[in-house]
Amino acid sequence: LDAAELMNVGVNYLREHVADDVRMHYTYINTDGPANVVPPYAATNYFVRSGKWERTLDASERVDNCARGAALMTGTRVEIERVTCNKEMKPNRALAEVFYEEMQKAPVPEYTEEEIKFAEKIAENAGLGGKAPEELFTGLEPLESEPVPLAIGTDVSDVSHTVPAVMLSAACMCKGTPLHHWAATAQAGMGIG
């Protein structure tokens, strides 16, 4: 556990020394025993991603080095298992145009009075500013003239290197809602989410 803790400290400092779009997430996945005893084994799961595959690989190797260094500091051993490494999305303009044409045929959302009031409360309590229904987008944005790069690699972006793929971005919460925020969770359980 001490080595895992030291690794996490190292990775948290590493955040200042990687590209701005690099994201490093982790969790402990296997620790047991009472709180006053250092367990003999600990495991963490790291998820490293960015908008470019090369930056993801570089940051992943640096995270691995944090694990190796922590093992050296504590006189323990480390086993590293690389499960996957996501590439950036491969743009496909032809498929995007077909997809957009079909989206233009789809009905736009219509919100109930209850959903609009809920959105107003969320916007107010989460400090998002503005007022519903302006906070509830009901249209279709124009198709971008150039591909919009994703901030991070995903499983879909990996697939796009094997088969043609596009990704849809849809409004499913009040404008300005941060994704990793209680307001996003609250809206996911409501009709607007």
Give residue ranges: language-model regions:
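Zn-dependent metallopeptidase/amidohydrolase metal-coordination segment
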Residues: 117-193
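Midchain, well-structured core segments that form catalytic/ion-binding scaffolds
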Residues: 1-125
